């Protein structure tokens, strides 16, 4: 019986950290890899790459824990989240707080192996991860904070590789914010009706009937900024083909969200994994030396 309870608790932690749903970690991973490849340029040192990949998974898990902790009183009223570990009682509030601390400490131990500039920037990463979940109570723009949180690995990657934060770093950071607002608005469209009832704010609610148009404008902005990064760094034609493929994926997402159906909006959100992958492959191939 004791082992059964332990198994049950571990499974609850697994669900709380969303390790069974890697999409969030992947959306955090791709911009991190973009930054590492542009900053190097090309393949970064294996240890730096390992630190950032592990850090992405740890901080995404920590972000999920603090997000569910912040939303624990709301999630019980939303159909999609009612069975999450905290509202269902599978994990206690104290256990969630302790798990968050452990994950953050592990991530910080990894960052401590890098240079001072990266360590200092990591403090802002922690602050953004902690603040984001609470923003949806006070502003209709929590997706902007999410974009900054998911994109903060970009200046950290540049700092770790080159100890500098050039123009390309901040253009990529801005591109990631636009991209995050676009895809998280798609995600928020799934819960829009429930969020309105319980008082949660989001860009999906703020944009209203202009949601599809604004998402499209944001997606065009992502393409323009990523193309500009390619030009500034002298990337080859293959990279621009990758940007165009990303544009085709954005067009497909627009088709999916056309009728604002919940399942289709969620499918559009999930499709953004391929946008990040395609752009990374374009960068990696541009820096590949045969």
Swiss-Prot record:
GO terms for biological process: ubiquinone biosynthetic process. It is an enzyme of class 2 (transferase). Pathway: Cofactor biosynthesis; ubiquinone biosynthesis. Its cofactor is Mg(2+). Its main location: membrane. The chain crosses the membrane at residues 23-43, 46-66, 99-119, 141-161, 163-183, 213-233, 234-254, 268-288. It holds the Pfam family UbiA. GO terms for molecular function: 4-hydroxybenzoate polyprenyltransferase activity. It is a multi-pass membrane protein. GO terms for cellular component: plasma membrane. HAMAP family: UbiA. NCBIfam families: ubiA_proteo. This is 4-hydroxybenzoate octaprenyltransferase. It comes from Salmonella arizonae (strain ATCC BAA-731 / CDC346-86 / RSK2980).
């Amino acid at each position: 019986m004791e082992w059964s309870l332990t198994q049950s608790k571990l499974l609850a932690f697994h669900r709380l950290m969303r390790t069974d749903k890697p999409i969030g970690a992947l959306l955090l991973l791709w911009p991190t890899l973009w930054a590492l490849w542009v900053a190097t340029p090309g393949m970064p040192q294996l240890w730096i790459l390992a630190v950032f990949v592990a850090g992405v998974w740890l901080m995404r898990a920590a972000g999920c824990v603090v997000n569910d902790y912040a939303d624990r009183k709301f999630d019980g009223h939303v159909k999609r989240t009612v069975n999450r570990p905290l509202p269902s009682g599978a994990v206690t509030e104290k256990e969630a707080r302790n798990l968050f601390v452990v994950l953050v400490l592990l991530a910080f131990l990894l960052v401590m192996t890098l240079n001072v500039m990266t360590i200092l920037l990591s403090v802002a990463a922690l602050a953004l991860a902690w603040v984001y979940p609470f923003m949806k109570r006070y502003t209709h723009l929590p997706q902007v904070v999410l974009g900054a949180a998911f994109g903060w690995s970009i200046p950290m990657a540049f700092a770790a590789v080159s100890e500098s934060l050039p123009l390309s770093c901040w253009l990529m950071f801005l591109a990631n914010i636009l991209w995050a607002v676009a895809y998280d608005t798609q995600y928020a469209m799934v819960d829009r009706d429930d969020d309105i009832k319980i008082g949660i704010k989001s860009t999906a609610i703020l944009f209203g009937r202009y949601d599809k148009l604004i998402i499209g404008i944001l997606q065009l902005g992502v393409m323009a900024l990523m193309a500009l990064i390619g030009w500034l760094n002298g990337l080859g034609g293959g990279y621009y083909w990758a940007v165009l493929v990303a544009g085709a994926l954005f067009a497909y997402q627009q088709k999916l969200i056309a009728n604002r159906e919940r399942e289709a909006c969620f499918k559009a959100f999930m499709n953004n994994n391929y946008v990040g992958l395609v752009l990374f492959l374009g960068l990696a191939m541009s820096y590949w030396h045969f």
